[in-house]
Amino acid sequence: MKSWSAKWKSSTQPRKQRKYAFNAPLHTLQKFAHSHLSPELRKKYGMRNIQIKVGDKVKVLRGQFKSKEGKVERVDLKDGKIYVTGVDYVKKNGSKVVFALRPSNVMILELQLADKKRKAKLEGSKKTSSPKLESKK
């Protein structure tokens, strides 16, 4: 039996959707690690979301750490989690542990643009804010 197939994405069966996500290769897991951009960045670059990277400044939108901000210090594609500085909890023995967040629960406030490919993608995707034409019925 196959362990993963790209065709399972189109299935409506929850078991196949789970199998698709759990057994996906890393290049597919990267597509799951996208986060929304802030309204300012969205307007500037003409994109709604982008893959999250180490060094991006993010704001937590959901959960017990809601409205906290920090920089992404680690991205774990296998588990689909990100780790943000300042978003940590204290264990019973007193040590601090960084809390794992899902990329869908954060919003990117500032982008890390040291990567030339990422910068080129953002610059190339700038869309002019022209009004959409209404279709005739």
Task: Locate each region found by the language model.
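Intrinsically disordered, Lys/Arg-rich N-terminal extensions and targeting peptides
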Residues: 1-52, 125-137
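Residue-level "contact hotspot" at macromolecular interaction interfaces
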Residues: 51, 63-66, 100
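Structured, basic alpha/beta domains of bacterial-type, RNA-associated proteins
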Residues: 69-125
